[in-house]
């Protein structure tokens, strides 16, 4: 059932479980990239997609209440909070002499705090009446931060300040992370929303979007092995989504080729 005017089906996968799995996978991927740079994109990039899937799942739940601003807006808010938190997590250890290995955990903690504050602000003074807005903003901030930092770490080959600044910020890769991760978080439910929405189909598209983000980063990095593996995974997952969509559709109409002249 849908809440308000949103429209999502029954929940097949508990949100907190999806969130925990996405968070753990993305953090593991960052540490793999830090300790084994040669596998940064192959493993780190793949596992960073987990944060995108978890973020998309939370977007599905909160957006079903009817945000009034459209589903994409909350995806952009997620990545806005996430970018601030990820950068703080990277820069604070070098500024205060903390261990570099604390970076992913520190970024996650900051993201939770930022998300909670933003969630409270959406209640008062903004006045949104969505009952789960505070918890959802907190979760989206966390997933946004882990997705941003995960893909940037995979590209840069580590999460120390010098690696991230030179390998992801100065070259603009963090902007790519913002857009790729943002689309992966906001698009799945935005594409599947409606009276016939199913959790399985939306999550399948979320996985496909996360894998596409990984593929984009693999291409940008020119990592041939990661490109091939990501492309195979994405084609299989997106193909599964298309089959589900055709199977769930009431009717499928194939548009013929447009006439070349009147």
From Swiss-Prot:
* Membrane-spanning residues: 35-57, 70-92, 97-119, 140-162, 172-194, 214-236
Q: Which GO terms describe its biological process?
A: methanogenesis, from carbon dioxide; methylation; one-carbon metabolic process
Q: Does the keyword Transmembrane helix apply?
A: yes
Compartments (UniProt record): Cell membrane
Q: Identify the enzyme class.
A: translocase
Broad class of the protein's primary localization: membrane
Instruction: Give the record's membrane topology.
Output: Multi-pass membrane protein
User: Please, which domain of life does this record's source organism belong to?
Assistant: Archaea
Which reactions fall under this protein's catalytic activity? 5-methyl-5,6,7,8-tetrahydromethanopterin + coenzyme M + 2 Na(+)(in) = 5,6,7,8-tetrahydromethanopterin + methyl-coenzyme M + 2 Na(+)(out)
Q: Which InterPro entries match?
A: THM_MeTrfase_su_C
**MF term (GO), any:** tetrahydromethanopterin S-methyltransferase activity
User: Might you report a single GO cellular component term?
Assistant: plasma membrane
> EC annotation?
7.2.1.4
Query: Which UniProt keywords are listed?
Result: Cell membrane, Membrane, Methanogenesis, Methyltransferase, One-carbon metabolism, Transferase, Translocase, Transmembrane, Transmembrane helix
Pathway it belongs to? Answer: One-carbon metabolism; methanogenesis from CO(2); methyl-coenzyme M from 5,10-methylene-5,6,7,8-tetrahydromethanopterin: step 2/2
The protein's job, in short, is: Part of a complex that catalyzes the formation of methyl-coenzyme M and tetrahydromethanopterin from coenzyme M and methyl-tetrahydromethanopterin. This is an energy-conserving, sodium-ion translocating step.
Recorded family membership: Belongs to the MtrC family.
Could you describe the subunit structure of this protein?
The complex is composed of 8 subunits; MtrA, MtrB, MtrC, MtrD, MtrE, MtrF, MtrG and MtrH.
This one is known as Tetrahydromethanopterin S-methyltransferase subunit C
Q: What organism does the UniProt record list as the source?
A: Methanococcus maripaludis (strain DSM 14266 / JCM 13030 / NBRC 101832 / S2 / LL)
In the UniProt record, the gene name given for this protein reads: mtrC
């Amino acid at each position: 059932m849908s809440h308000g005017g949103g429209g999502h089906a029954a929940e097949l996968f508990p949100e907190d479980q999806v969130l925990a799995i996405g968070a753990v996978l993305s953090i593991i991927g960052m540490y793999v990239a830090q300790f084994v740079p040669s596998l940064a994109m192959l493993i780190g990039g793949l596992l960073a997609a987990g944060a995108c899937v978890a973020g998309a799942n939370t977007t599905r739940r909160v957006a079903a209440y009817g945000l009034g601003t459209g589903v994409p807006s909350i995806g952009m808010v997620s990545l806005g909070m996430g970018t601030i938190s990820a950068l703080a997590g990277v820069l604070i250890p070098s500024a205060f002499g903390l261990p570099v290995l604390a970076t992913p955990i520190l970024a996650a903690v900051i993201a939770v705090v930022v998300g909670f504050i933003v969630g409270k602000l959406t209640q008062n003074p903004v006045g949104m009446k969505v009952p789960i807005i505070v918890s959802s903003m907190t979760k989206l901030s966390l997933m946004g931060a882990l997705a941003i930092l995960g893909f940037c770490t995979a590209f840069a080959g580590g999460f120390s300040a010098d690696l991230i600044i030179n390998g992801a910020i100065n070259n603009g890769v963090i902007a790519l992370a913002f857009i790729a991760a943002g689309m992966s978080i906001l698009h799945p439910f935005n594409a599947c929303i409606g009276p016939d929405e199913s959790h399985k189909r939306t999550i399948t598209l979320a996985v496909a979007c996360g894998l596409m983000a990984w593929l984009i980063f693999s291409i940008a990095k020119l990592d041939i092995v990661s490109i091939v593996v990501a492309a195979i995974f994405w084609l299989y997952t997106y193909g599964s989504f298309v089959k589900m969509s055709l199977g769930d559709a009431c009717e499928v109409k194939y548009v013929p080729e447009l006439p070349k002249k009147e």
